[in-house]
Structure formats: C-alpha cells, structure tokens
C-alpha cells in the first residue's frame, strides 16, 4: 500500500470505491492499490547504435525495464530483423543532425551505443564517435532531454593506446565526443567500459572507477544494465566513469554506486 493509504482507508469514508466511479479516478485508485508507484512505460528512450552488439543489449534491458524504445537506424527494415517488433523505428543517422531532431520528438531520454567501423571511411571515428556524438548531444540539449547516456570506452585519455594506431585514433575521437557531450548542456552520463565480452550479465559485480587508469573486461549485458540504471538516478548525472567486472556479487544499489563518483568539472571549449 502507498504511504498514507491503508486497506482500512479504502473501506472508510475517506476513500471509497463509490467516490471514484469512472474515468481517471479509477486509474488513480488502481495506482494506489498497486502501491502508488508510476510505471516507466510512458518514458520513451531513443537508442542510437541500437543494432550493434552493445545497442542490442541496451534495447533488451530497456524493454525488460518497461520503457518504450525507439531505435535510430539507417535501415528500419533491416533493424527490425535484428531487434523485432517491440521497438519503434526512426530512420536516421547520427552524422545528420536533422534526422536526430526528428527522432527525439516525444523522447525523455537517449542512450548512445554508436561506434565507428573499419569498412567505410565515412563511418570512421571522426565522423561517428566525434561529430555524430556531438550532433546527438546538441540535439538532446535542444530537445531538453532529461538525460543522455553515452557508451564511450576506457582508454580515451591515453593517446599512446595501441587502438589509436590500429584504428584511426578511435579513442582520441571518442574523447573529443565526450568533450562535446559535456559542453552541450544536456544532463549526461558517460560510461567507459573496458574490454567487451559476450559472457552472461548479472553474474558478478562491477567496478566503477574514475581517472582512466584501470584495466579489465565487462560483459556487454552488464554495460547495458548500468546504462539503464543511470537513467533514473540523479546521482549518475554529469559523471564520467570506467566500468569493469568485479569479483563481488551482483550489484543492486546503483544509486549508492553512482553517488560515490565525483561529478565532472565544468567543461572547457570544444575544438571544432
């Protein structure tokens, strides 16, 4: 029962079923009987990069949590083959700002799981991990979203990281994308996972670190769990952290974990 309402209260003169005969009052009464909590089902989340390995896990986690999910995809028909029918589809591309603006209509949150590919230079790190993320952040700020969660990567501050030599300075461009998110003005959470694995999620705890000095691995499913947990936690806002698996048992108190993190300092100017 919700606080202030008891079973006796519903049978007394204060609140009776006769007094809530029709319409919205019935809905309110049912909500009270259910415990007074509001479902997140009406909250729409736009997911960029929804068909990728991390994005698919994010969509699955959002659906399990009762959110409405809208996937920003280049090919809706192809995406439907991957994600199924329990998702809305908005045709667009993070490299094209106008398509993001349209896709964000009605959304309360957004999660980015985008990443560059080696196959097409036009999908390289500069254009996806920096310019695309900047487009998404600025569109999210213009749409006054409650929060933008961005999956980045551990190692973004290490210019000598081998991945930069192997893949067109991918971590440097991801770092530039992070800077654009911080400067955009939208409330945000930046998640920097370590090496990604396909192991089942929820089997162990996770380590939330700051300073970009650690190493480790993390299941994709656990990255998705943390992203979705951050959506409803004020303690996660305007924070950047690395994410690795831990030896402890599965985490349950996400608010406490986020609250132990330091908030990001005020952002500086972003290079064009």
State the predicted function of each range.
Residues 116-210, 215:
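Glycine-/Pro-rich loop/turn segments that contact NAD(P) or position catalytic residues
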Residues 45-46, 50-53, 71-142:
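NAD(P)H-binding glycine-rich loop region in Rossmannoid oxidoreductase-like domains
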Residues 37-41:
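Sec/Tat signal peptide C-region and signal peptidase I cleavage site
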Residues 42-51, 57, 221-272:
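Mid/C-terminal beta-alpha module of Rossmann-like enzyme folds, strongest
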Residues 62:
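Aromatic pocket-lining residues of Rossmann-like dinucleotide-binding sites
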Residues 96, 132, 177, 219-222:
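Conserved cofactor-binding/catalytic machinery of classical short-chain dehydrogenase/reductase
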Residues 25-35:
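Bacterial N-terminal signal peptides
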Residues 15-27:
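Bacterial N-terminal signal peptides that target proteins for export
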């Amino acid at each position: 029962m919700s606080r202030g309402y008891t079973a006796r209260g519903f049978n007394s003169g204060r609140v009776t079923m006769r007094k809530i005969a029709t319409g919205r009052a019935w809905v309110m009464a049912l909500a009270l009987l259910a415990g007074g909590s509001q479902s997140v089902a009406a909250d729409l989340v736009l997911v960029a990069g929804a068909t990728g390995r991390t994005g698919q896990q994010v969509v699955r986690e959002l659906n399990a949590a009762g959110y409405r999910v809208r996937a920003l995809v280049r090919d809706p028909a192809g995406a439907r083959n991957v994600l199924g029918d329990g998702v809305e589809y908005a045709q667009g591309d993070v490299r094209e700002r106008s398509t993001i603006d349209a896709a964000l209509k009605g959304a309360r949150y957004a999660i980015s799981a985008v990443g560059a590919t080696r196959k097409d230079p036009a999908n390289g790190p500069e254009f996806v991990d920096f310019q695309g993320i900047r487009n998404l952040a600025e569109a999210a700020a213009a749409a006054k979203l409650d929060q933008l969660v961005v999956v980045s990567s551990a190692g973004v501050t290490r210019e000598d990281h081998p991945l930069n030599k192997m893949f067109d300075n991918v971590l440097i461009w991801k770092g530039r994308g992070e800077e654009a998110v911080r400067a955009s003005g939208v409330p945000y959470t930046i998640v920097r996972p370590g090496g990604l694995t396909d192991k089942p999620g929820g089997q162990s705890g996770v380590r939330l670190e700051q300073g970009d000095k650690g190493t480790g691995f993390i299941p994709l499913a656990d990255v998705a769990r943390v992203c979705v947990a951050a959506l409803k936690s004020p303690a996660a806002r305007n924070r950047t952290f690395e994410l690795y698996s831990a030896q402890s048992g599965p985490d349950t108190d996400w608010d406490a974990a986020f609250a132990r993190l330091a908030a990001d300092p005020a952002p500086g100017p972003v290079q064009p």
